[in-house]
C-alpha cells in the first residue's frame, strides 16, 4: 500500500503549494502540529514574521488522511525513507508527474503554484496589499511581478474588452 500512500502524499503536496502560496522551502518545514493549528508561523526572506494559513477544507482533508495513515506528529511531507522531503525531491517528482501526464515540465515546478495562488487570490478577492502580506512580500511591487499576464492571456482580455 506504499504506492497509494505516496500518491496521496503528492496529491497533498500539490494542494498545499496551490492553496497556501508557500515557497517550496517553507512547505517542507510544515509539521502535522501546524496542520492541527491551522497555520504555520515562519520568518520570511526579509526576516519578517509571516503566518502561512492552511485553508479549512485543506486542513480537514489533511487531518483525515493523517488519521488513515496513523500519523500524529513530525514533518507533514516525507520521502519514501520516512525522512523529511527535500526541495529538490519535490521539484524532481513534479517533473516526473508532468512527464507522466503529458504536461509541459517547464511550467510545472514548485514556484509556478505560488504564481497561480497569487492570480487566483486576486481574481476572487481583489486586495493586492493583503496578498502581499500573505505572500511575505515587503513591497506590493514584488507581488505585482507574480500577476503579469502571458501574451495569450493579454490577447484574450483585449479580445473580450475591446469590442468597438
Residue ranges and their predicted role:
Residues 15, 19, 114-138, 145:
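C-terminal catalytic core of tyrosine-transesterase DNA break-rejoin enzymes
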Residues 4-24, 69:
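Basic, Lys/Arg- and aromatic-enriched nucleic-acid-binding interface segment
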Residues 23, 104, 138-141:
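Short coil/turn motifs that cap or connect alpha-helices
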Residues 29, 37, 145-148, 163:
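Phosphate-coordinating loops and pocket residues in cytosolic domains that bind phosphorylated ligands
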Residues 20, 25, 29-64:
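Conserved tyrosine-mediated DNA breakage-rejoining catalytic core shared by Y-recombinases
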Residues 10-11, 87, 91, 114-115:
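Short, leucine-enriched amphipathic alpha-helices that occur as contiguous helical runs
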Residues 55-105:
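Active-site/catalytic core of tyrosine-dependent DNA strand-transfer enzymes
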Residues 46, 135, 140-160:
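Catalytic-site neighborhood detector that most strongly recognizes the C-terminal catalytic loop/helix
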Amino acid at each position: 500500500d506504499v504506492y497509494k500512500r505516496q500518491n496521496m502524499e503528492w496529491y497533498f503536496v500539490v494542494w498545499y503549494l496551490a492553496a497556501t502560496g508557500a515557497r517550496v522551502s517553507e512547505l517542507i518545514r510544515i509539521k502535522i502540529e501546524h496542520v492541527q493549528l491551522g497555520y504555520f508561523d515562519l520568518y520570511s526572506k526579509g526576516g519578517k514574521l509571516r503566518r502561512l494559513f492552511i485553508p479549512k477544507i485543506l486542513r480537514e482533508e489533511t487531518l483525515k488522511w493523517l488519521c488513515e495513515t496513523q500519523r500524529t506528529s513530525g514533518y507533514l511531507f516525507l520521502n519514501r525513507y520516512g525522512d523529511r522531503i527535500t526541495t529538490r525531491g519535490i521539484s524532481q517528482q513534479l517533473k516526473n508527474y508532468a512527464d507522466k501526464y503529458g504536461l509541459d515540465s517547464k511550467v510545472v515546478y514548485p514556484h509556478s503554484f505560488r504564481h497561480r495562488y497569487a492570480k487566483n487570490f486576486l481574481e476572487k478577492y481583489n486586495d493586492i496589499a493583503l496578498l502581499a502580506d500573505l505572500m511575505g512580500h515587503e513591497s506590493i511591487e514584488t507581488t505585482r511581478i507574480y500577476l503579469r499576464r502571458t501574451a495569450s492571456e493579454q490577447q484574450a482580455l483585449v479580445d473580450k474588452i475591446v469590442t468597438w
